[in-house]
């Protein structure tokens, strides 16, 4: 019986010794190692291709200047900012489309009696020449909606960043400014129209006033007074007499 046990043990040991070695213990240069190397190279190549495709789908981060310019459109504005009437200005309009001008290039302004985002408009007092009535303006002015104002001077004389696009209730509104400026500093050769050039020097100039606009302060939107062109006036001075 003992001889049978010894025989079985010897056969078992011989079988283990004759078994093929595992791939983990295969010497360098064996077929198993070559397959693993090929697999690793293929995986590395696929990884490089994947990384290139990822870089193409996700380009490198933009420069700081580009991120700063585009950050304003991503800032969500609290609707409560528009509920205070003292922040509303008749020359500032928030709209999803360019506001129209009335016919004959008359000046128009934004009506904000009920809602800041209301796009109703009304014609203001005529500031351009009305030749058919025999009435003329001392200075010729032009009024336009300015859509892409990014910088302005605040009430303290410091430059501020103006928000071009405003994200409000998941809708992007553009901030428009109704500006008026002189068409020509000298509508007539002598200066302002209708001024006695024999006794007065005159010229037309654009004046500015302050309006409340939505500006950027860090990463937050805030109301500030900024300067915009609002009128064209005539400046006169008495001519000095030569004695």
Swiss-Prot record:
GO molecular function: growth factor activity; lipid binding; metalloendopeptidase inhibitor activity; nerve growth factor receptor binding; toxin activity
Disulfide bond sites: 139-204, 182-232, 192-234
Cellular compartments annotated: Secreted
Keyword list, A-Z: Cleavage on pair of basic residues, Disulfide bond, Glycoprotein, Growth factor, Lipid-binding, Metalloenzyme inhibitor, Metalloprotease inhibitor, Protease inhibitor, Secreted, Signal, Toxin
GO cellular component labels: axon; dendrite; extracellular space; synaptic vesicle
UniProt-listed InterPro entries: Cystine-knot_cytokine, Nerve_growth_factor-like, Nerve_growth_factor-rel, Nerve_growth_factor_bsu, Nerve_growth_factor_CS, Venom_nerve_growth_factor
Extent of Basic and acidic residues compositional bias: 47-66
Region annotation Disordered: where it falls in the sequence: 47-69
One Pfam family per UniProt: NGF
Glycoprotein is among the record's keywords: yes
Family matches, as SUPFAM superfamilies: Cystine-knot cytokines (SSF57501)
Propeptide residue span(s): 19-125
Tissue expression summary: Expressed by the venom gland.
Signal sequence coordinates: 1-18
Single GO biological process annotation from the record: nerve development
Glycosylation: residue positions: 148
Family: Belongs to the NGF-beta family.
Record function comment: Nerve growth factor is important for the development and maintenance of the sympathetic and sensory nervous systems. It stimulates division and differentiation of sympathetic and embryonic sensory neurons as well as basal forebrain cholinergic neurons in the brain. Its relevance in the snake venom is not clear. However, it has been shown to inhibit metalloproteinase-dependent proteolysis of platelet glycoprotein Ib alpha, suggesting a metalloproteinase inhibition to prevent metalloprotease autodigestion and/or protection against prey proteases.
UniProt subunit comment: Homodimer; non-covalently linked.
Name under which the protein is recorded: Venom nerve growth factor
Organism: Oxyuranus scutellatus scutellatus (Australian taipan)
Lineage: Eukaryota, Metazoa, Chordata, Craniata, Vertebrata
